A protein has these predicted regions:
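Accessory nucleic-acid engagement/destabilization modules that flank
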Residues: 2-15, 19-243
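Conserved mid-sequence domains
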Residues: 246-247
């Protein structure tokens, strides 16, 4: 089933163009120039970078919801308009989706990076990270329960995407230090900065000059490899860090 993330209608031709969701989720991963901030919250080296990239790969997971997909009907989504859904933004829906999976350890084990922490403990320490990532539109998402925005097929497809996306980040690891109270406090302190990084990644990943829209399904690994090469050009447009003047 095809899920869209972005849509634009040509004002002259009247023809709509979509960008498939799976590929938008991946190109948002292309910012690793935040080492100082991430190091302060326990993310270091390649495993930390891949953890953050893995986290970003689900930033718009709420767009799998039928209530979002029915805004632009594509092949395979024709039934969405017939379903009565609650009116929530995709950031709230994404957070709610993750919180639901947190209650299912067997499923959770299949989509989380490795860690010395147990599955239940990993779910606990990841809650703030999921909130920061899904809430990348200026406000932390509030937990909503008993939502009917996702059909059973929506949930199955979103879960399948998360399973496949995890394979792209083999070195990703959830640090044991995440359970420490001091690290949790620092994560909350820097949460707005981290969310800002997610926004910046989203903006860069949405730049069609570097990342062309894709409306036909291709293997995630193929698209990811291509996106990585384009990311080098995309990140080159960012200004360098300012130097501190000596007085």
């Amino acid at each position: 089933m095809r899920y869209w993330a972005k849509y634009r209608k040509d004002p002259i031709l009247g023809v709509g163009k979509i960008h498939l969701l799976s590929y938008h989720l991946l190109v948002t991963n292309n910012l690793f120039g935040a080492a100082d901030t991430l190091c302060k919250v326990g993310l270091e080296g390649e495993s930390g970078a891949q953890f953050f990239a893995w986290l970003l790969s689900s930033h718009d997971i709420g767009k799998f919801a039928c209530s979002f997909q029915r805004e632009v009907l594509v092949e395979g989504q024709e039934d969405c308009r017939e379903i009565v859904c609650q009116n929530f933004r995709h950031d709230v829906l994404g957070y709610a989706f993750w919180r639901e999976i947190f209650e299912e350890p067997e499923k959770l084990e299949k989509i989380l990076p490795r860690s010395e922490l147990g599955t239940g403990r990993r779910a606990g320490v990841l809650d703030i990270w999921i909130s920061v990532t899904t809430g990348h539109h200026g406000i932390p998402p509030k937990l909503k329960e008993n939502l009917n925005n996702f059909t059973s097929q929506n949930k199955k497809d979103a879960f399948q995407y998360l399973e496949e996306a995890l394979t792209l980040f083999p070195l990703a690891e959830i640090p044991v230090c995440f359970k420490q109270k001091e690290v949790r406090h620092r994560t909350k302190y820097y949460s707005w900065v981290i969310s800002g990084l997610v926004v910046l990644c989203d903006w860069i990943g949405s730049n069609e000059k570097f990342f062309q829209w894709v409306d036909e399904e291709i293997p995630l690994k193929v698209y990811w490899d291509k996106a990585l090469s384009e990311a080098e050009r995309a990140l080159a447009i960012l200004p360098s860090s300012p130097k501190v003047s000596e007085f």
